[in-house]
From Swiss-Prot:
It comes from Chlorobaculum parvum (strain DSM 263 / NCIMB 8327). This is Large ribosomal subunit protein bL31. The lineage of its organism: Bacteria, Pseudomonadati, Chlorobiota, Chlorobiia, Chlorobiales. PROSITE patterns: RIBOSOMAL_L31. Part of the 50S ribosomal subunit. The keyword Membrane does not apply. Belongs to the bacterial ribosomal protein bL31 family. Type A subfamily. GO terms for cellular component: ribonucleoprotein complex; ribosome.
Amino acid sequence: MKPEIHPKYTKVTVNCANCGTSFETRSTRNNIKVDICSSCHPFYTGKQVLVDTAGRVERFKKRFAKAAPKAAAN
């Protein structure tokens, strides 16, 4: 490798914006900020968070309830 052409590889702190957890790793960047980490990600914690975006589930159930009596009548 040629000297003085590679970026410096140093210890950096990775900060999670969601839960506030921080840990050290090595990188060529100064500081790393992540949106979600293994401490708060549902896959790793086993806790699933259901997010109902703008009542889409309720709208679907309402449409399905209207269609069900028509299908039963035929």
